[in-house]
Regions:
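Sensory/regulatory domains in signal-transduction proteins
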Residues: 37-96, 123-139, 146
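A general boundary/transition motif marking the beginning of the first structured unit of a protein
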Residues: 29, 120-123, 169
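Exposed alpha-helical structural elements
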Residues: 19, 32-33, 40-41, 93, ...
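Structured interaction and signal-relay segments at domain junctions
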Residues: 1-59
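Signature of lipid phosphatidyltransferase scaffolds
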Residues: 98-128
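Amphipathic alpha-helical coiled-coil "transmission" helices that mediate dimerization
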Residues: 134, 141-185
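Short alpha-helical "patches" and their helix-cap loops
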Residues: 93-98, 102, 147-154
Length: 185
């Protein structure tokens, strides 16, 4: 998993990548394709403001889930990297457009790592995607509400502090007047 900005650049540490994906992201030829794939998914998800499901250049099913709070795109969550043989034909397949011949040898050499990846039906994958989308965006909304409430409380604290200062000054002035009155007797 990785959280990325709209360009596909990671903004958090990537976690739980498979051995195959770690190899690919550390390979000079493949890493740029992985980042481009992340960017493709992120842009699609940002524009549609819903999950974008696609096949990465290595032929693995991935998803970019937009993080949208109050209509504002904040970034994306990239995940998946699973094998899937029953995806609809209209699912974007980046392996067809990102110089597949240049990476075929690398993929073939690491076929054992590729075969270790789990295989999901497209329906099961989409069930997981929809659940994660719901959770991520609910967390974003909750965080936004907490932030707004904190800001409101900070404004109230400032008002109370100002009022307290004003009352303290008024009290000090009244104390001085009382002292003046007592001194003039």
């Amino acid at each position: 998993f990785a959280t990325v900005d709209y360009r596909g650049e990671p903004i958090t540490e990537s976690t739980s990548f498979s051995s195959f994906c770690r190899m690919a992201r550390n390979d000079g030829q493949l890493s740029l394709r992985c980042k481009s794939s992340d960017a493709f998914g992120s842009i699609q998800a940002a524009v549609m403001q819903k999950p974008s499901v696609y096949f990465c250049p290595c032929g693995l099913l991935e998803v970019a889930i937009p993080i949208v709070v109050r209509g504002h795109y904040l970034g994306g969550f990239i995940g998946g990297q699973v094998r899937c043989s029953d995806a609809p034909e209209d699912t974007s397949r980046l392996e067809k457009v990102m110089a597949p011949a240049a990476i075929e040898g690398i993929i073939e050499k690491n076929k054992d790592l590729l075969e270790q990846l789990p295989e999901y039906s497209f329906e099961k994958f989409m069930d997981i995607v929809n659940l994660i989308f719901l959770i991520i965006n609910q967390l974003g909304e909750n965080e936004m509400h907490l932030q707004m409430r904190w800001e409101k409380q900070q404004k109230q604290v400032k008002k109370l502090y100002s009022l307290n200062q004003k009352l303290a000054e008024e009290s000090a002035q009244k104390d001085l007047k009382i002292l003046d009155l007592e001194a003039s007797r």
